[in-house]
């Protein structure tokens, strides 16, 4: 039996999914060191003051500007009718 090409069903919408990437927080490493210091030396330990100040400085630092959103899905929706040979939307 000859191999037939695989035919995919028609799509209602063309869409490109963005990768779900969590933003990395630069203060997580400092926070883990503060928690480790508290766990080993006690909560009110004076030896953890430098690490606590580093955490405060990190948390008070301004956040970086957000990246602009990708517009590929917008443009695909605009050109969908042309790409699907003018078939009507259902």
UniProtKB/Swiss-Prot annotation:
The keyword tRNA-binding does not apply. Keywords: Disulfide bond, Mitochondrion, Ribonucleoprotein, Ribosomal protein. GO terms for molecular function: structural constituent of ribosome. Its main location: mitochondrion. GO terms for biological process: mitochondrial translation. One of its GO terms (cellular component) is mitochondrial small ribosomal subunit. It is found in: Mitochondrion. Disulfide bonds join 27-58. The keyword Mitochondrion applies. Component of the mitochondrial small ribosomal subunit (mt-SSU). Mature N.crassa 74S mitochondrial ribosomes consist of a small (37S) and a large (54S) subunit. The 37S small subunit contains a 16S ribosomal RNA (16S mt-rRNA) and 32 different proteins. The 54S large subunit contains a 23S rRNA (23S mt-rRNA) and 42 different proteins. Component of the mitochondrial ribosome (mitoribosome), a dedicated translation machinery responsible for the synthesis of mitochondrial genome-encoded proteins, including at least some of the essential transmembrane subunits of the mitochondrial respiratory chain. The mitoribosomes are attached to the mitochondrial inner membrane and translation products are cotranslationally integrated into the membrane. Belongs to the mitochondrion-specific ribosomal protein mS37 family. This is Small ribosomal subunit protein mS37. It comes from Neurospora crassa (strain ATCC 24698 / 74-OR23-1A / CBS 708.71 / DSM 1257 / FGSC 987). The gene is mrp10.
